[in-house]
Amino acid sequence: IEGISFNAAERGQFNFFFFFGLNDATRYREVVEGIEANNFTFGSIGLSTNYLQSATNYAQGWKVGVAGTNRNYKGAARATYSSGLMENGWAFTAQLAWRYTPYIDIKGQIGEGIAYNSFGYFLTAEKQWGKDKRLSLITFGAPTRRGQSAAVTQETYDLTNQYNKTSWGHNNYNPYWGYQDGKVRNSRIVETYDPTVIASFDWQINEDNFLKAGVGYHYSMYSNSALTFYN
C-alpha cells in the first residue's frame, strides 16, 4: 500500500479483510507479474500489487450506493467523497461502508445460522508543494463480526434428513447454530479488526531521480469462538 508492504508476518500473505466493503478505496492499484521490473517491490512468484491511496488518485465528487440481496449479505451501503486538489494544495478522500445480515434462522435457506455486520472507514489527506513534493496521510479499517458455517459431508446431509424427517438434510445445513434460551446463537463467531495508518512522502528531485519514503502502523485483531460441552 503506497509502496509499504503489509503482508502478514506469520504467513507472508496479504489479508484482504483489511478492506471489507471499501471497494472505492482500493480501486486504483499497480499489478506486476513475477519479477517484472517495477517501482515498488522486488517481485515474487505470482503477482505483486501496490494500492495507490493518495487523495489525488480519486475522481472529484460524490458516490453513493445501496444494495440488497437474498444471499449471505442482506444489505449494503457505501458513500465516497473526494475533494480533488484544492487551491491551497490539499486534497481529501473519504469512504464509509456498511454490510449487514441478521441471523438467518430458517432451515434450508442459503446462509442458515450465519450473521454478518461490518463497518469500513477510509480517509486520506494529501498536501502538495509545487509539482514535485507531496505528503499523504492515510488511515482505514473494517471492524467485522460474522457467524460461520461448517464444511459438511454428503453423509451428514443424508443422516440429518433420514433421522429428523425435516428439511435439515439439504445442502445448506449448518451445524454451528441453534437456539439458546430461545434466541438464535452461532457457536463460531469471528471478529476481526485491522486499523492501519500510513504516512507517505514523494519527491521528484529531477528528471532522473525520484524519492519515495513511507512509514506505516498496523494492528491486527482476530478472534474465533467455539462451544464445548460437559456432562
Regions found by a protein language model. Give the residues of each.
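Extracytoplasmic loops and strand-loop junctions of Gram-negative outer membrane beta-barrel proteins
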Residues: R11-F14, V31-E33, G61-G65, I104-G108, ...
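Transmembrane beta-barrel wall of Gram-negative outer-membrane proteins
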Residues: G68-P102, I106-S149, V197-A199, W203
